Amino acid sequence: MAWIPLLLPLLTLCTGSEASYELTQPPSVSVSPGQTARITCSGDALPKQYAYWYQQKPGQAPVLVIYKDSERPSGIPERFSGSSSGTTVTLTISGVQAEDEADYYCQSADSS
């Protein structure tokens, strides 16, 4: 049974000229194909800001997979979903497929 590593680097995000926020993700998550992967991102600003999730594969540009905490762009499979609770947001990939192996980044942005 193969394991799919989902690599999750720490991302520090500056949102505007006067403020910067640190978002923390776990170093990595590995799951077997068909399992559910839950990737968390924590930061003090998250209750006041929307979270955005990006998938990036080697040699490719990042792809937005979730915006405004839980909205899924057109063309993104339904197995990708997002949720938010307090200072933590979660990207869930249900029924992980081999093609989901990638880096996943969270970003925050003002909700106004």
UniProtKB/Swiss-Prot annotation:
Residues 71-106 are annotated as: Framework-3. Residues 1-19 form the signal peptide. GO terms for molecular function: antigen binding. Residues 20-112 form the Ig-like domain. Residues 68-70, 107-112 are annotated as: Complementarity-determining-2. V region of the variable domain of immunoglobulin light chains that participates in the antigen recognition. Immunoglobulins, also known as antibodies, are membrane-bound or secreted glycoproteins produced by B lymphocytes. In the recognition phase of humoral immunity, the membrane-bound immunoglobulins serve as receptors which, upon binding of a specific antigen, trigger the clonal expansion and differentiation of B lymphocytes into immunoglobulins-secreting plasma cells. This is Immunoglobulin lambda variable 3-25. It comes from Homo sapiens (Human).
